[in-house]
């Protein structure tokens, strides 16, 4: 099988390339320029040359594709718009759905590949594409690195052409295997949380790149009592305690962002609860009539799965309503809610639109 392997130059993607090569497939190493030099000084010709050298040394053909304009349109601009609307977006999940398994996968097909492999820590069954087959997405075997949450928005037909060689590996074993083989990744450091934001400082990035962000407004309790002023809703996240600048009899937390009033609603730890959330843009990987009675959700990446009741809304097939089995810390609107069964199979994923 001809498989394109998405390579960034890091440990995980280089190991994925090695695994696919050693399995005997025809391989093209596919490197995407998602960021232009205007977005980051780290995207340089030197890095690309180093990545190409490493890939060719392993015996793979190498191809570079400039997708920076599309990345700005499909990932960066929606990221900025979400903050303008008082939401906390998840650009990595959007990138997986629209870029890595969207436009980059399209590039792979144009190069003659039947599948695209990446360095994600997640599993697919079956593990190799088979014509006409549907696939199921599962949590990776390394609980500390599992990335199925970020993949829950990738459509079924895209996953059907994907390969995840790292799904059954743990990160420390990946590093050890490369070291044993004497293979040094050209960009060996861990990738930052959001690739287009230097130092993961989203506030500095938005200040420099986003016009029209909402300004200061009142900070209020649930009863409407004003206890202070915030510096712009985009600078806060639900559940946040630090940085509120309020002297109160007990610690206060961000309960919600009232965009209509440009008000930041705060309250005590006891008030920091939610019964559920409503999601839009739902990507269904397993038909709901095939779901087990017991399902679970994750509304944050490093969160343990929590029991919930999940049902499609009556107003459309791409929405769903999530009711937590027990009161839960409010998730942030704009984040992903991924639905699982008890064994770790991903059933669906959607964008949190509102919390109640």
UniProtKB/Swiss-Prot annotation:
The gene is mnmA. The keyword Transferase applies. Transmembrane segments: none annotated. It comes from the Bacteria. Keywords: ATP-binding, Cytoplasm, Disulfide bond, Nucleotide-binding, RNA-binding, Transferase, tRNA processing, tRNA-binding. It holds the Pfam family tRNA_Me_trans. CDD domains: MnmA_TRMU-like. Residues 145-147, 300-301 are annotated as: Interaction with tRNA. Belongs to the MnmA/TRMU family. Its EC number is 2.8.1.13. GO terms for molecular function: ATP binding; tRNA binding; tRNA-uridine 2-sulfurtransferase activity. This is tRNA-specific 2-thiouridylase MnmA. Catalyzes the 2-thiolation of uridine at the wobble position (U34) of tRNA, leading to the formation of s(2)U34. InterPro entries: MnmA-like, MnmA-like_C, MnmA-like_central, MnmA-like_central_sf, Rossmann-like_a/b/a_fold. It is an enzyme of class 2 (transferase). ATP binds at residues 6-13, 119. Disulfide bonds join 95-195. The active site is at residues 95, 195. GO terms for cellular component: cytoplasm. It is found in: Cytoplasm.
């Amino acid at each position: 099988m001809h498989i394109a392997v998405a390579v960034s130059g890091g440990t995980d993607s280089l190991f994925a390339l090695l695994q696919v090569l050693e399995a005997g497939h025809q391989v093209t190493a596919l490197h995407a320029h998602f960021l232009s030099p205007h977005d980051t000084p780290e995207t340089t010709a030197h890095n690309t040359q180093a990545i190409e050298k490493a890939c060719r040394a392993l015996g793979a053909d190498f191809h570079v594709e400039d997708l920076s304009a599309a990345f700005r349109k499909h990932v960066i601009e929606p990221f900025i718009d979400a903050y303008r609307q008082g939401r906390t977006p998840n650009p990595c999940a959007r990138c997986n759905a629209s870029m890595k398994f969207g436009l980059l996968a399209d590039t792979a097909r144009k190069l003659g590949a039947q599948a695209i492999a990446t360095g994600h820590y997640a599993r697919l069954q079956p593990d190799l594409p088979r014509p006409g087959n549907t696939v199921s997405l599962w949590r990776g075997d390394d609980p500390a690195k599992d990335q199925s949450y970020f993949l829950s928005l990738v459509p079924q037909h895209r996953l059907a052409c994907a390969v995840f060689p790292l799904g059954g590996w743990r990160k420390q074993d990946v590093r050890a295997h490369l070291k044993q083989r004497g293979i040094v990744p050209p960009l060996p450091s861990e990738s930052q949380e959001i690739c287009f934001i230097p130092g993961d400082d989203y506030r500095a990035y938005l200040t420099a790149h986003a016009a029209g962000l909402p300004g200061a407004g009142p900070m209020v309790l649930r009863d409407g009592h004003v206890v202070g002023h915030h510096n712009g809703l985009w600078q806060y996240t639900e559940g946040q305690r630090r940085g509120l600048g309020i002297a109160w009899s007990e610690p206060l937390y961000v309960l919600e962002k009232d965009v209509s009033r440009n008000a930041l609603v705060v309250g005590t730890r006891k008030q920091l609860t939610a019964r559920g959330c409503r999601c839009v843009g739902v990507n269904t990987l397993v038909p709901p009539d095939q779901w087990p009675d017991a399902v679970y959700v994750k509304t944050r990446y490093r969160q343990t799965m929590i029991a919930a009741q999940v049902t499609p809304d009556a107003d459309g097939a791409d929405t769903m309503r999530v009711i937590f089995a027990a009161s839960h810390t409010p998730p942030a609107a704009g984040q992903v809610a991924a639905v699982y069964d008890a064994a770790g199979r991903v059933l669906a994923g959607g964008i949190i639109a509102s919390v109640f």
